[in-house]
Each structure stands twice: as structure tokens, then as C-alpha cells.
């Protein structure tokens, strides 16, 4: 999204459930990041003063942060529904450009941080329609205007990740306390209801040399026992080979990180892509292997045939010499 002659990379940080990252931590990291850019002589491009239509909004990075929890929401229909609420900040919908069905997104530029975005399932459960931008929902006794309605991703990996998340939140009797229905709202507004740790931080930043962006994040971002993942090049050949090398170990997590649904979906897609790479390689090699086997068999057959011919020829020559010897000797 957007364009530039510079190299950029997208990197995500996933934080453990006992993490202490908050808005102050994000602001502090941004200051540290900008200082690191200066130290490495990385600057945002200056707009052309001679061009009145030049873009003056150029920046070196874009970031987003989020945290999630469960809450009850009520709307026009009687009763309430339990949803997964994601508190978002920064350019969240730049990283997650969900399709809008009505209205618009929420952002840090909003005058009031009290608007929400519903997904289609939540909108249907509460109002029976997705065209509900401008209406209101009630959360903890407070009303929130609806900024817009989005359509959640419908690919197989996301569906599986959402199902897994709902099952993981089931109570001991097996009843799901979580729902695949979702609502998005300002992180500040959601955090004001109950202290909500930030569990995901995402950023696009310069990567002048391959690996620079991830290294900078690893060294400067207070990830603690969390995980840093570079999404750029994730599904490249080298990236999938790396997944194959860690196959099996990927499911063993001991760092206390609960990945958001989009990362679980990405990891699932990675595993499938790696499996397809293995199968594609095997099927690609199979004709060559079969041809090699056939050639080896033909070669061995010809060698054996030549050996038998040579052996018979030698025997015939020996017999011929014996016959000549007997004839010449009068035997």
C-alpha cells in the first residue's frame, strides 16, 4: 500500500499475556526509533518545493497496536451478545484493511474516541442488518456511535483461527464463552473500561539492508519474552524452507504468547504452503527419479547382456581352439 523507492519491511511483535506494554511504552519506543533513524542517516524524503501537488505526508514508518478482550454489547434487538472486542490504535486498519460494508473505520484522528466498528455478524445479531453506520450500541451502560461495519476475512485459515479462538475460551462444561463476532474500538476507550494490556504491535519501517528492520525491532522494542516476526518475505522460498526446518517445533510455545487470530491464520497458511512446497518438490523430482531408475535398469541390462555375450564368445573361442588343436594333432 503506497509507494516508495526505499526498501521497507513489515514486522510484528506479539507480547506475552503477563506483559506490561502500555501506551507510554509505545510512545517511548517511537522516540527511540526516530533517534535510531537519525543515527543511521535514514530520513523521510523531502517534498519537491517546486511541485505544488507534491505529497507532504511522507513518513518513515507506520505502526499499530492492539489488545483484545471479551465483553457484552447490546443494540436495537432485545438482550445482548458476547463479542471479541479489539482495542486498536495507530494505523490499525492500514495493516488490516477489512472490507467496509457501510460507514468508515475508527482512527486516532477521531475527535472523540467513542466510536466503534462492528463486523457483519455482530451487526446482524444486534440490528438484523449491516447498514447500521450512525446507530448506537451500548457497552457497560455507555452508548457508542457506530462508525462502520466491516466484513471479516473469509479464507479457510482465518475461519479455522477464529474457531480455535472460540473453543479455547470455552468454559469447563464446553460452552463457548467467546464468540467469532467482533467489535473494534479505540484502545484508549476499551482500556478505560478495564486495564487492557497491548498484545500486538505492528510496524512498517525502512529496511535498507535485508534484516535491518527486524534487528532494529529486536534490539529496541521491549518485547520481553514475546516474539518478533517479519512478515515481509514470509512466504518466499527461503521463508518456507525455514518453516520446513522448524516443522513440529513450531507448535511448542513456552513464552506465554497467545497469538491474535490473524497471526494464527498466517502460521496455518505458512504450514500449508510449506507442505505444498515439499509435495511440489517431490512431484517435480519424481519424473527425474523414475527416468533415472529406468536408465539404470536399461544400463544394467545391457551390461549383463554384454557380459553374457562376451562369456559365450570366449567359450566358443576356447572350444574352437581345442577343436583345431585336436584336428592338427590327429587326435
Describe these PLM feature segments.
Residues 266-288:
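N-terminal membrane-entry
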Residues 12, 27-102:
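Short amphipathic beta-strand/extended segments in non-transmembrane regions
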Residues 21-48, 181-183, 210-223:
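Well-ordered, non-membrane alpha-helical segments in soluble/globular domains
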Residues 83, 88, 112-113, 117-118:
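A conserved catalytic-core signature of glycosyltransferases
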Residues 90-101, 118-216, 220-267:
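Mid-to-C-terminal secondary-structure elements
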Residues 8-17, 63, 198-208:
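Short, hydrophobic/proline-enriched secondary-structure or compact coil segments at domain edges
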Residues 2-28:
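Membrane-interface junction motifs in transport/secretion proteins
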Residues 285-330:
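Juxtamembrane interface at the cytosolic side of transmembrane helices
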Amino acid at each position: 500500500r503506497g509507494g516508495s523507492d526505499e526498501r521497507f519491511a513489515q514486522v510484528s511483535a506479539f507480547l506475552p499475556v503477563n506483559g506490561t506494554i502500555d501506551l507510554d511504552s509505545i510512545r517511548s519506543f517511537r522516540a527511540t526509533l526516530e533517534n535510531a533513524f537519525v543515527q543511521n542517516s535514514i530520513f523521510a524524503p523531502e517534498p519537491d518545493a517546486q511541485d505544488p501537488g507534491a505529497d507532504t505526508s511522507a513518513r518513515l514508518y507506520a505502526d499499530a497496536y492492539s489488545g483484545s478482550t471479551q465483553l457484552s454489547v447490546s443494540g436495537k434487538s432485545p438482550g445482548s451478545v458476547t463479542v471479541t472486542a479489539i482495542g486498536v490504535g495507530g494505523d490499525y486498519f492500514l495493516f488490516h484493511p477489512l472490507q467496509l460494508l457501510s460507514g468508515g473505520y475508527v482512527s486516532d484522528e477521531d475527535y472523540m474516541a467513542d466510536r466503534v466498528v462492528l463486523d457483519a455478524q455482530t451487526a446482524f445479531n444486534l440490528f438484523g442488518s449491516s447498514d447500521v453506520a450512525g446507530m448506537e450500541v451500548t457497552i457497560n451502560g455507555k452508548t457508542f456511535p457506530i462508525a462502520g461495519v466491516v466484513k471479516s476475512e473469509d479464507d479457510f485459515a482465518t475461519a479455522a483461527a477464529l474457531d480455535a479462538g472460540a473453543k479455547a475460551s470455552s468454559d469447563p462444561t464446553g460452552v463457548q464463552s467467546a464468540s467469532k463476532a467482533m467489535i473494534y474500538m479505540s484502545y484508549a476507550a476499551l482500556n478505560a473500561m478495564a486495564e487492557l494490556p497491548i498484545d500486538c504491535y505492528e510496524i512498517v519501517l525502512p529496511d535498507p539492508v535485508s534484516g535491518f528492520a527486524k534487528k532494529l525491532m529486536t534490539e529496541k522494542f521491549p518485547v520481553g519474552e514475546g516474539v518478533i516476526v517479519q512478515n515481509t518475505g514470509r512466504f518466499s522460498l527461503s521463508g518456507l524452507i525455514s518453516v520446513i526446518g522448524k516443522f513440529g517445533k513450531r507448535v511448542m510455545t513456552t513464552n506465554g504468547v497467545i497469538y491474535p487470530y490473524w497471526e494464527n491464520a498466517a502460521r496455518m497458511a505458512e504450514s500449508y504452503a510449506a507442505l505444498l512446497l515439499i509435495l511440489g518438490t517431490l512431484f517435480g523430482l519424481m519424473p527425474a527419479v523414475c527416468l533415472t531408475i529406468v536408465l539404470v535398469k536399461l544400463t544394467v541390462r545391457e551390461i549383463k547382456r554384454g557380459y553374457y555375450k562376451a562369456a559365450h564368445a570366449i567359450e566358443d573361442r576356447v572350444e574352437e581352439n581345442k577343436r583345431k588343436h585336436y584336428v592338427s594333432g590327429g587326435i
